[in-house]
Amino acid sequence: MRIILLGAPGAGKGTQAQFISTAFNIPQISTGDMLRAAIQAQTPLGLEAKKVMDDGKLVSDEIILKLVKERINEPDCQQGCLFDGFPRTLAQAEALRQENITINHVIEIDVDNEEIIQRMSGRRVHLASGRTYHVIFNPPKKEGVDDITGEPLIQREDDTEETVRKRLEIYHNQTAPLIDYYREWEEKDLLQAPKFSSIKGSGSVEEIREKIFTELNA
């Protein structure tokens, strides 16, 4: 089974991706990992991508798609794979379709912007140990300090409200149109299109996991 998992940053894709990957015994494929591996192995595509990146440019969809085709033909992908962060744009989704790369299921984890902002901007971290807290959902015993060492907790720059809002804006402009694309494709062509499911991402990790697996096993 080949699965695409969509959702805004902070929607909980990473956690659910691990569950899916383990349950179906399929690898989680990220374009970033593929690029790094190809560059490290100095494959022809890796060298081509490195040259583009060294020039300070973005790697083209054409190169990304070639990497994807190479990766899904490797032995560990015979049972399928889970795409993580791909496709990112309508152009990439359309290219996948034109290449006749079969996708069985597209799952969107849908969480309201304000809930994502609350989730992410409430995170606090103890840098030395990596212990993570949340001001609402998992607060430290004493506000602003680590339970064990008593040292101060920090808010990572990535988790500030301003940064989260910017990341959400990029997602809604660039990646969210994929949701309409896959939904409309399924409506027009039930036989060829991947099954599309939108899952509400509010609730416990287990509740969301159950909803996703109900759709995948339907």
UniProtKB/Swiss-Prot annotation:
ATP binds at G10, A11, G12, K13, G14, T15, R123, T132, Y133, G203. It comes from the Bacteria. InterPro entries: Adenyl_kin_sub, Adenylat/UMP-CMP_kin, Adenylat_kinase_CS, Adenylate_kinase_lid-dom, P-loop_NTPase. It is found in: Cytoplasm. One of its GO terms (biological process) is AMP salvage. AMP binds at T31, R36, K57, L58, V59, G85, F86, P87, R88, Q92, R156, R167. It catalyses: AMP + ATP = 2 ADP. Pathway: Purine metabolism; AMP biosynthesis via salvage pathway; AMP from ADP: step 1/1. It is an enzyme of class 2 (transferase). Its EC number is 2.7.4.3. SUPFAM superfamilies: P-loop containing nucleoside triphosphate hydrolases. GO terms for cellular component: cytoplasm. Pfam families: ADK, ADK_lid. Residues 122-159 are annotated as: LID. Residues 30-59 are annotated as: NMP. Catalyzes the reversible transfer of the terminal phosphate group between ATP and AMP. Plays an important role in cellular energy homeostasis and in adenine nucleotide metabolism. Monomer. PANTHER family: NUCLEOTIDE KINASE (PTHR23359). Belongs to the adenylate kinase family. HAMAP family: Adenylate_kinase_Adk. Consists of three domains, a large central CORE domain and two small peripheral domains, NMPbind and LID, which undergo movements during catalysis. The LID domain closes over the site of phosphoryl transfer upon ATP binding. Assembling and dissambling the active center during each catalytic cycle provides an effective means to prevent ATP hydrolysis. This is Adenylate kinase.
